[in-house]
Amino acid sequence: MKKYNKLRIEWDCRRGMLELDKIIMPFYLTHFHELTDDKKDIFIRLLASTDLQLFSWFFNLAKSQDVELQMMVEYIQKVQKIIIN
């Protein structure tokens, strides 16, 4: 089991858009500990994306070209019960 810098991850979860703060931080606080190490690594990579990228992915305006990131976005949408038509 890998060790993760929880303070760094929590800091990276803080975004410049309130909409993203309402999605990403609650997911981190509630579900991050349940993820496998591989999925935790993908989540951390997701946090390196820009706010505009994340907004477009979470609100289904675009899809990430990175399959793993897109799968993580869809997983977060599912567990956070985000319904965007």
UniProtKB/Swiss-Prot annotation:
A GO biological process of this protein is:
succinate metabolic process
| Protein localization | Cytoplasm
The record ties this protein, via Pfam families, to: Sdh5
For this UniProt record, the keywords arranged alphabetically read as follows: Chaperone, Cytoplasm
Asked if Transcription is a keyword of the record, the answer is no
Q: Which Cys pairs are S-S linked? A: none
Superkingdom of this protein's organism: Bacteria
Q: Which GO terms describe its cellular component?
A: cytoplasm
Q: Which Gene3D superfamilies match?
A: Flavinator of succinate dehydrogenase
Q: Does the keyword Protein biosynthesis apply?
A: no
- Where does the protein principally reside? cytoplasm
Q: What does this protein do?
A: An FAD assembly protein, which accelerates covalent attachment of the cofactor into other proteins. Plays an essential role in the assembly of succinate dehydrogenase (SDH, respiratory complex II), an enzyme complex that is a component of both the tricarboxylic acid cycle and the electron transport chain, and which couples the oxidation of succinate to fumarate with the reduction of ubiquinone (coenzyme Q) to ubiquinol. Required for flavinylation (covalent attachment of FAD) of the flavoprotein subunit SdhA of SDH and other flavinylated proteins as well.
The family line of this record is: Belongs to the SdhE FAD assembly factor family.
Which protein, by its recorded name, is this? FAD assembly factor SdhE
Q: Which organism is it from?
A: Haemophilus influenzae (strain ATCC 51907 / DSM 11121 / KW20 / Rd)
